[in-house]
Amino acid sequence: MKRLLLLAAASATALGVTAAKAEPLKIGIIESLSGAQTSTGRLYANAVEYGVNQINKAGGFNGEPVQVTEYDNAGGAPEAADKFRQAVADGVDIIFQGASSAIAGQLTEDVRKHNIRNPDSKVLFINLGGEAMELTGEKCQFYHFRFTTTAPMRVNALVNAMKAAGDLGTKVYSINQNYSWGQDMQKAVEDAADKGGYKIVGQVLHDVNKIQDFAPFVARIKAANPDTVFTGNWSNDLLLLMKATGDAGLDVTFATAFLDQPGNIANAGKTALGDYIANNYDNSATDGKFAEAYKSATGHYPVFVEGNSALALAQLQQALKTLDFRGGKIDVTKIALALEDSTYDSPVGPISVRKADHQTIRPVVVSKVVKNPKYPADGTDMGFQTVKIVPGDQAIYPVQSSCHMKRPKE
């Protein structure tokens, strides 16, 4: 089911009589809006809609309000491919997606092939959450932009911050989902072992969104007796892992990528205190202005993936301001080139785009679960407190040798 949103329609009046003649910029959200990943997919969609609303409040683009259509991929790559074809038929110019690297991998290939076959109606893919290394490696392509971190960026930030704080220990366990992202996380933990001064005492890759009870996995973790458990799990696989951890009263520090997903702190209970997360954004790392603006518009502070996703739209808005199609045809290639040249001063630091692979060079925020924070989570007295912000130029890694991007003729 799709939902067409003409956000901030009142802005159309301000655009005057030319609005009816102009070509609107069309955005498609191809997201997990049903199934096991809905809790994540809906937050991505919410953030995109918020960001588009901000663009429209400022006057829209190309003489029209920006249009947004939601497409439900139901958490699957084949469904995402079907929805991409539907989006193309609807004339979508830019697609957004975040929940699952597997789906992002499907979409970036769909976009690449479509653009080769249809040079006069290209589509741009802005990836909000697919963090698999291959997306800016062997699958890198000009019309894909990644507005999030990757496993090495998160793991290295965690290792450095936790070691400096004396919270890392010398024994580490790794539990991750068995697909591209989880495999990248496991490798990043292995690669950081020497620098972190720890030994890996156990690691496991498990099926994605199929485990209903993580108690056996928690028992294995307990038996290995680690100081820290690294996990890139997200959605139900993290919610259920945290529940099993809380139920078992497991006394171990978790180093995570997505602990701020709603429900995780409540599920883990007091065992969450002292756990870490490396993320794109944390309300506590900012002056609060963006968080308050988001709350004013949506009724809640940005949580989980909403912050960095909304900021990606703000960076797109900044890039669009440099373009003027005079109400005529939308040129996606020019939008991509404008994005390449953009640097956005986000609430946690500057975000730019590396032209060689379209990985954003962005700050990584390391936070720790504490009692009585400024922004409590899940209706508890616990939440996140920023420990360190790693600047983008320190967090980024070299372009992968497997990336051979073909650029358009300029």
What are these regions (language model features)?
Residues 1-21:
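Gram-negative bacterial Sec-dependent N-terminal signal peptides
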Residues 28-49, 71-78, 99-100, 175-184, ...:
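Extracytoplasmic "Venus flytrap"
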Residues 39-43, 61-137, 147, 206-214:
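Beta-alpha junction/loop-to-helix N-cap segments that form part of ligand/metal-binding clefts
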Residues 46-68, 194-199:
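Signal peptide-proximal N-terminal region
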Residues 77-85, 134, 142-248, 280-289:
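Extracellular/periplasmic Venus flytrap/periplasmic-binding protein
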Residues 87-101, 118-128, 171-176, 225-235, ...:
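Periplasmic-binding protein-like
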Residues 141, 242-313, 321-325, 381-409:
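Extracellular/periplasmic periplasmic-binding protein-like sensory domains
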Residues 343-410:
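Solvent-exposed, acidic/polar segments of extracytosolic/periplasmic ligand-binding ectodomains
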